[in-house]
């Protein structure tokens, strides 16, 4: 039995992939292969999107020079643990339709689907992913060459092989466990959202 299985219990018969995947901070510094990185983005490529606009953009760092630049975008507690990740990814959502210039209302939703596809594929490869809101969003545009007029900075992602909890700063040891989820009954309602 894995730690995930000991802590998490599905309420329905879902694929174990959904329950076993969790967002580790402890990541091994071992580099990922070009083939592994390609597979992650191939999974993201096949995510569904409204009108097939595929509004996501991923800028990643896996080489020493680009990793050094990417680490400067981390902030807060993320600096302490994510700096050792062998792959850092920054995710953006396109703001406007490429043909009409109209706002893409579903861009963030669709970009989230692409990130989820990447995360599940990473788990299938024996890798761990952790999304980070704690990045210098305002600096991502210039440092990564992404036009702010066209894209919105969403998240950073640290990716790597699972590492040892003891590699983390002591204050993060207790938090390095899979967490639980709300019951489906708390967020899925047939017909109408009930009055509270």
Regions found by a protein language model. Name each.
Residues 1-196:
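Acidic, surface-exposed loops and disordered segments
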């Amino acid at each position: 039995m894995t730690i995930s299985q000991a802590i998490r219990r599905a309420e329905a018969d879902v694929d174990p992939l959904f329950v076993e995947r969790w967002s580790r901070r402890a990541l091994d510094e071992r580099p990922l292969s070009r083939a592994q990185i390609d597979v992650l983005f191939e999974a993201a490529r096949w995510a569904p999107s409204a009108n097939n606009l595929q509004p996501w953009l991923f800028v990643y760092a896996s080489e020493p020079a680009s990793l050094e630049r990417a680490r400067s975008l981390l902030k807060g507690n993320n600096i302490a643990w994510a700096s050792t990740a062998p792959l850092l990814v920054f995710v953006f959502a396109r703001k406007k339709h490429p043909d009409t210039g109209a706002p893409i209302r579903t861009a963030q939703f669709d970009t989230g689907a692409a990130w989820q596809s990447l995360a599940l594929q990473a788990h299938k490869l024996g890798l761990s992913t952790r999304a980070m809101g704690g990045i210098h969003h305002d600096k991502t545009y210039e440092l990564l060459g992404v036009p702010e007029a066209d894209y919105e900075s969403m998240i950073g992602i640290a990716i790597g092989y699972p590492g040892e909890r003891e590699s983390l700063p002591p204050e993060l040891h207790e938090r390095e466990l899979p967490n639980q989820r709300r019951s489906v009954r708390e967020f899925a309602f047939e017909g109408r959202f009930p009055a509270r």
